[in-house]
C-alpha cells in the first residue's frame, strides 16, 4: 500500500445485510432483558418483577423484537377491564441500535394484528410533554391507520411523589377498525 487513502467505488462496495428481527410473544425468560433494555434507556424503570409478570400474565398483549436471541425491542400492554375495545400501551422500549428504523410502529402493528386484539378499536398510552419521540410515534400510528389521535390530560404532576415527574397526557388513537 502506498500510504494514500483508497477510495472504493460503489461497484466494489460490500453489501451489508441488516438482520431480520423476530417479533413474537415474550416469555418469562425475556423479562430480565426487557428490564435491562428499559434500564439502559430513558424509560421509567419498573422492578424486574413487573417485566417478568407482564410476560407471564399478559403475553397476549405484549411483544418482543429479537435479533437472534437478543431482545432489541418490546411493548408491555394490556386491555383495561373497563375498556375491552382498547389496548393500553404501558411501555415501548427499543435498543439504541434499532432506533430510527420504525421498530416501534412495527411492534404496535404486529401486536394489534393478534387474535387477542381482534376487538381492539383504540390504542391508548400516556406520554409526558417532553417525550417527543413517543408523541411522534403515536401520531404516526394514527396517520398510518388513517384515524384520529386525540390528546387529553391524564395524570397531573401533583399526583406523583417527589418533584421530578411530568404530567402524563393520554394519547388515544382510533377507531382502528370499522
Swiss-Prot record:
Pfam families: Acetyltransf_1. Its EC number is 2.3.1.178. InterPro entries: Acyl_CoA_acyltransferase, Ectoine_EctA, GNAT_dom. It comes from the Bacteria. The keyword Thylakoid does not apply. GO terms for biological process: ectoine biosynthetic process. Gene3D superfamilies: 3.40.630.30. Residues 21-174 form the N-acetyltransferase domain. Pathway: Amine and polyamine biosynthesis; ectoine biosynthesis; L-ectoine from L-aspartate 4-semialdehyde: step 2/3. Keywords: Acyltransferase, Transferase. CDD domains: NAT_SF (cd04301). GO terms for molecular function: diaminobutyrate acetyltransferase activity. Belongs to the acetyltransferase family. EctA subfamily. This is L-2,4-diaminobutyric acid acetyltransferase. It comes from Shouchella clausii (strain KSM-K16) (Alkalihalobacillus clausii).
Amino acid at each position: 500500500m502506498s500510504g494514500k487513502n483508497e477510495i472504493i467505488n460503489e461497484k466494489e462496495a460490500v453489501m451489508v445485510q441488516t438482520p431480520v428481527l423476530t417479533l413474537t410473544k415474550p416469555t418469562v425468560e425475556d423479562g430480565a432483558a426487557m428490564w435491562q433494555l428499559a434500564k439502559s434507556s430513558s424509560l421509567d424503570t419498573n422492578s424486574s418483577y413487573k417485566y417478568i409478570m407482564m410476560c407471564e400474565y399478559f403475553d397476549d398483549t405484549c411483544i418482543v423484537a429479537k435479533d437472534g436471541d437478543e431482545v432489541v425491542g418490546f411493548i408491555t400492554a394490556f386491555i383495561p377491564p373497563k375498556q375491552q375495545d382498547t389496548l393500553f400501551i404501558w411501555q415501548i422500549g427499543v435498543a439504541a441500535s434499532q432506533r430510527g428504523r420504525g421498530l416501534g410502529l412495527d411492534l404496535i402493528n404486529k401486536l394489534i394484528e393478534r387474535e387477542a386484539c381482534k376487538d381492539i378499536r383504540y390504542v391508548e398510552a400516556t406520554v409526558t410533554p417532553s417525550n417527543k419521540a413517543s408523541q411522534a410515534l403515536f401520531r404516526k400510528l394514527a396517520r398510518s391507520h388513517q384515524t384520529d389521535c386525540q390528546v387529553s390530560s391524564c395524570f397531573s404532576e401533583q399526583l406523583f411523589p417527589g418533584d421530578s415527574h411530568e404530567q402524563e397526557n393520554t394519547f388515544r388513537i382510533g377507531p382502528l377498525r370499522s
